[in-house]
């Protein structure tokens, strides 16, 4: 499925084109036949371009499959100048991502859950706040390097550039979940053609995700 969106003045995305074609070259979210996948992508893109009345040159693509993994991590740094800056946030995120992952996996997302300043919990926007110690709790999502490369290769063979690779259920959450739902607690379940993707949100952030290689 290919979807074309137009960004409105108020920051909302309006869908102006949709294209679809059976995904013959994918099995349970993973490319198993490059030629068939390329053909399916081309057909879906052509339909979306025709409906939207524009040419597509780059895309954001979703990723799923049983190869996707996730874990919670955290990092701690000293706050420079006693006031949190964007540099401090970057450093603490880097500290949180410094965990060992299998050699065949790559990091897809580092999703902040909350920040703590001098043990004060529940902070989501720490920049400008005072303190001496900054801690970040994050949810890290990884996927097989080869699976991601094959998706990118198929898209590039269609003459398109890949702007970003996004976890399927994370992309779904942007379109169907409200801020209040994520804050109070919600589980999104996306039953697709090859996988069933789920994600649990609480406190405004993702807490857990899973991919089940069984679908509709």
Listing of model-derived features with the role each one plays in the protein:
Residues 200-202, 210-211:
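Active-site proximal loops enriched in glycine and acidic residues that flank catalytic Cys/His/Asp
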Residues 1-5, 196-200:
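Short beta-strand scaffold segments in enzyme catalytic cores
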């Amino acid at each position: 499925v290919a979807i074309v969106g137009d960004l409105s003045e108020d920051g909302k995305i309006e869908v102006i084109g949709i294209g679809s074609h059976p995904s013959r070259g994918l099995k349970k979210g993973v490319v198993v036949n490059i030629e068939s996948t390329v053909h399916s992508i081309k057909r879906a893109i052509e339909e979306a371009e025709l409906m939207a009345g524009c040419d597509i040159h780059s895309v954001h693509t979703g990723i799923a499959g049983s190869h996707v993994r996730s874990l919670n991590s955290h990092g701690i740094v000293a706050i420079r100048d006693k006031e949190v800056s964007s540099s401090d946030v970057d450093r603490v995120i880097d500290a949180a991502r410094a965990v060992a992952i299998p050699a065949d996996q790559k990091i897809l997302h580092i999703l902040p859950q909350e920040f703590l300043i001098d043990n004060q919990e529940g902070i989501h926007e720490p920049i400008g706040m005072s303190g001496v110690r900054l801690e970040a709790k994050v949810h890290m999502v990884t996927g097989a390097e080869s699976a991601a490369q094959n998706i990118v290769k198929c898209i590039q063979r269609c003459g398109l550039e890949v702007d970003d690779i996004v976890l399927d259920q994370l992309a779904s959450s942007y379109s169907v979940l409200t801020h209040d739902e994520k804050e109070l607690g919600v589980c999104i379940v996306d039953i697709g053609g090859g996988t069933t993707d789920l994600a649990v949100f609480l406190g405004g952030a993702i807490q857990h995700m899973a991919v089940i290689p069984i679908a509709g």
